[in-house]
């Protein structure tokens, strides 16, 4: 049972980290090949830019909880083993508790880069939308100078 919890939680967190990496690579490739002047509607551009970013944010915000779930389950199994054993083996208890805590560490190891990646991708999206605005609504320098003198 302990191995199932351990491998299940850690395996799921590794799977989530692979998803985040795949989305990051796909988005960076999309951003690199994007031409903002190909879009005539800002809303369509924003939809294209924000594709799959919600999934990255969801993984980043929930990975610590998944790791915590693994820790809680590991601690519960340790207490069950402790309750069913006739003697107290301090070494086994400490080893099991340490192994249970690695799930929380793994959750944080997935969450922190996922949130950083999400923030970088959102910022890049904002920059591209601003470039679209500049391309489609250039500032008339003469009228801008007239209004700034008034």
UniProtKB/Swiss-Prot annotation:
Q: Which residues cross the membrane?
A: 5-25, 63-83, 97-117
Where it sits in the cell: the answer is: Cell inner membrane
The protein in question is named: Putative biopolymer transport protein ExbB-like 2
Major location category of this protein: membrane
Q: Which UniProt keywords apply?
A: Cell inner membrane, Cell membrane, Membrane, Protein transport, Transmembrane, Transmembrane helix, Transport
Under the cellular component aspect of Gene Ontology, which terms does the record hold? plasma membrane
Any one GO BP annotation for this protein: protein import
Membrane-protein topology? Multi-pass membrane protein
